[in-house]
Amino acid sequence: MIQSKTLYACPGSGEELNFSDTGFSTSDGRRQFPTVDGVPNFLAYPSIEDGEQVQTLIWLNEEARTKGWEASLRAVYGKSSGIYQYVTDEQRAAFLDLLPLNDQAVVLEIGTGLGQITAPLAERCKLVYGLEVVPGQARFTGERCRQSGLTNVLVAAGGDDCQLPYASSGFDVVICNLVLEWCAAREQRIQAEAGQRQFLSEAFRVLKRGGNLWVNTKNRFSLRNLFDSSGGRTDDGKRTGRLRKVMLSLVGKNRHDGLTHSYNKLTAMLQEAGFRDLQSFWAAPEMRCPTAFIPTDPASVRAARQAGNLVQGDTRSTRLLMPLVPAPWVKLVMPGLTFLAKKYESGEI
């Protein structure tokens, strides 16, 4: 249930919004943000999902309301499907143990998907705001949380213009899990990297002083990108050869993976956005479903390897190659780039 007093604000201007039964609006009424099924819509652009995708999400939400959220996933996608496993695997939320969460924390999760992180996150926090660019997925996340008895979740559709529809300095933690590489994909006015930089600046803006940003994204120079002979696929589904994929990766134009960066480049982007005290983690064996988060300093990498039972890759080639990578270089070729970064005000440090 949306309350009249929230952290929602007009994207771009930051202007306070008035709330009514139909949604949110600016005080002069010139900008309107309608609410559908409890989900306000702050999207700047029309949806890019095709008709089949839209209809699938409509079916999913109808099934969720009548049969329950988990039964709807089974009915629409099948219990053995990759998407069912992906959005019900509790291990995907393991990174929450690394975050400074408590029963007073107000958290923003950007990119809720189908609520796979939102629900366990809400169990640990006072209040969770979720933002998702696909309205059908946002509605499913809200329904999933309601059916789980989580009344402390507010989900909105928005962020496609790399603007966050929230007031400044409102959140203790902002979570950006496997979103950064895609965050500017729908923004039509600026280049992708400029959109990503704007997105990081927005995350900095909405955090409280001393708040933390969690970023987990793909690594342009991961071993899998560079050496996995399976290659990948382009946006039209065609296979890419290993060499072509490597060359695309090197220049940051592997569209199948979104716009990705090196460890050093992303570090610089976070610092330029204002973040400090960057902590980096190696999500092993892979950043989507990790079983371990290892600090990337050489001593921690060596200790994790020596402890045994560490799976160092999710493909045959990466499992063979990663143990050979010197500890100081692991952060450069690990599957994903994972950071916990802190906001300080100018001149504070």
Regions found by a protein language model. Give the residues of each.
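A C-terminal cap/extension of S-adenosyl-L-methionine-dependent methyltransferases
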Residues: 279-348
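A short acidic, Gly/Pro-enriched loop at the edge of an enzyme's catalytic core
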Residues: 162-174
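N-terminal, positively charged/glycine-rich alpha-helical extensions of SAM-dependent methyltransferases
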Residues: 4-6, 16-76
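A short glycine-rich, Lys/Arg-flanked "PGG" loop and its adjoining helix->strand segment in the class I
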Residues: 193-212
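Short alpha-helix
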Residues: 257-274, 280
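Class I SAM-dependent methyltransferase SAM/SAH-binding core
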Residues: 116, 120-162
